Amino acid sequence: MQRITIDPITRLEGHGKIEIFLDKEGDVANTYFQVPELRGFEKFAEGRPAEDMPQITSRICGVCPTAHHMAATKALDALYKVDPPPAAKKIRELVYSAF
């Protein structure tokens, strides 16, 4: 099995790497995203209302709070099985494009 390693990865505060394993046909068989630092936010979030997560996760990192906020918001969309209206999708795109 062929392995592709991207180490270090950029646009990440701290350390991290990605390992991609390809099968005999060259298709991705498995992928691992590894970040060795434990931040402990998972424990901090346990027992909290899901609706609080965008505000809590935006404090994970001082470099990219918006990305964490938006990821938590998308997770809420999936949790509640909602599709944001087109205007909201455009606004989210604009926010992502600001960085």
PLM feature segments, named:
Residues Q2-F99:
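Active-site- and interface-proximal helix/loop "cap" or "latch" segments in soluble metabolic
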